[in-house]
């Protein structure tokens, strides 16, 4: 979000910007992501405003065939490096401080050397508030007995021997990616146990596409969605009708999802995921032992040769609501459904175009992700 904000700010104003980054290179959490990760939305929906991400082409093979490309980790990290080194730094108005952390009041510490520097600034922009985390840098919340093979998805491509089985822990996008990777690498679905504490509502990627050829059906889908919401007399009625019309997808028709994190799949991917029959719903892992998986209210027998894939990090943490504009402090948050980088760019535009803080906050209303059955659509 920080680079998307900066891109618009230096385009629409004459401001200078110091970017403080704990990572060693531009790209944020994408530097830590698993190697087979891809965007769940078309590349053109992502990136900074001044430079397109991707080639605006459609995939011709695989489960995304016929739909617009999904950037890979390599593409994303390369893209953000180019934005920084080919646009931001040559402008002379952006100073980039990698391997650094912001302390307070303009004080910055270099993580490698420990050297502290103070900068003078008119405004401070917190681009970390959404607190995006990935399993590779987040310890599991459950106990793990010594000798248990519990890995983040990053390590899957490095395995040299097939285990007795795989246990995928988590119900979000990362878990979906891990399951699809296993299936696409010829792991028998019977060898996969999927622990899903919560199920999520999923969107059909075919209806989340750029380009004029998709415009009519996407517009009709939006109209249909609002008509169903307006005509419903209860949440259950609304969700049931949205599922019936294919507007919302679910992994298991018998399980009511309780979260929405903007995850998308194709029909082929959904069929693949539904092949996994060994699923434990509504239970959380408390401890993994060599021969047992201890859940909050049950025990599942396993074997020492089982590999556990931790997908439980909170990719988008639920944070307390706070105003985006507070004096000389800006807190970047989502103001457009499922569009974090667009939100950051929009906030920068509003900051550049308007003076009154109340007006700015009115234009940039904070938007949350669904937890439980209630989801505020914007």
Q: Locations of the language-model features?
A:
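Long, internal scaffold/assembly segments composed of regular secondary structure
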Residues: 216-222, 226-310
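Rossmann-like dinucleotide/flavin-binding elements
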Residues: 1-13, 155-206, 342-378
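Glycine-rich dinucleotide-binding loop and its adjacent helix/turn
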Residues: 66, 72, 76-79, 128-186, ...
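Feature captures the FAD/FMN-dependent oxidoreductase FAD-binding
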Residues: 60-134, 262, 269-295
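N-terminal low-complexity, Ser/Thr- and acidic-residue-enriched intrinsically disordered segments
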Residues: 1-37
């Amino acid at each position: 979000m920080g680079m998307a904000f900066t891109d618009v700010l230096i385009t629409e104003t004459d401001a200078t910007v110091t970017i403080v980054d704990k990572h060693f290179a531009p790209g944020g959490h994408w530097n830590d992501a698993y190697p087979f990760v891809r965007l769940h939305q078309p590349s053109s929906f992502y990136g900074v405003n001044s430079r397109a991400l991707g080639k605006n082409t459609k995939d011709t093979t695989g489960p995304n065939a016929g739909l617009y490309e999904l950037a890979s980790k390599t593409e994303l990290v390369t893209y953000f490096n180019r934005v920084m080194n080919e646009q931001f730094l040559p402008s002379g108005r952006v100073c980039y401080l990698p391997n650094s952390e912001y302390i307070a009041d303009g004080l910055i510490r270099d993580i490698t050397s420990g050297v502290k520097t103070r900068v003078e600034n008119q405004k401070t922009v917190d681009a970390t508030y959404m607190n995006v985390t990935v399993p590779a840098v987040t310890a599991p919340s459950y106990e793990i007995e010594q000798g248990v093979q519990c890995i983040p998805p990053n390590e899957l491509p490095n395995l040299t021997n097939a285990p007795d089985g795989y246990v995928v822990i988590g119900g979000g996008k990362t878990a979906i990616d891990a399951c699809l990777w296993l299936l696409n690498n010829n792991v028998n679905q019977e060898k996969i146990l999927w622990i899903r504490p919560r199920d999520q509502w999923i969107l059909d990627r075919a209806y989340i596409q750029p380009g004029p050829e998709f415009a009519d059906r996407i517009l009709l889908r939006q109209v249909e969605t609002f008509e169903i919401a307006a005509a419903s007399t209860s949440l259950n009625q609304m969700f049931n009708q949205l599922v019936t019309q294919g507007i919302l997808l679910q992994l298991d028709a018998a399980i009511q999802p309780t979260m929405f994190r903007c995850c998308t799949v194709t029909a082929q991917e959904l069929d693949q995921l539904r092949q996994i029959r060994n699923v434990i719903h509504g239970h959380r892992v408390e401890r993994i032992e060599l021969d047992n998986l201890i859940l909050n209210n049950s025990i599942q027998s396993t074997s020492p040769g089982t590999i556990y894939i931790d997908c439980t990090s909170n990719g988008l943490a639920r944070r307390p609501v706070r105003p985006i504009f507070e004096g000389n402090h800006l807190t970047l948050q989502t103001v457009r459904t499922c569009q974090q980088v667009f939100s950051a760019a929009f906030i920068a535009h509003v900051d550049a175009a308007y003076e009154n803080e109340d007006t700015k906050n009115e234009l940039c209303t904070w938007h949350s992700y669904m937890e439980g059955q209630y989801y505020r659509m914007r």
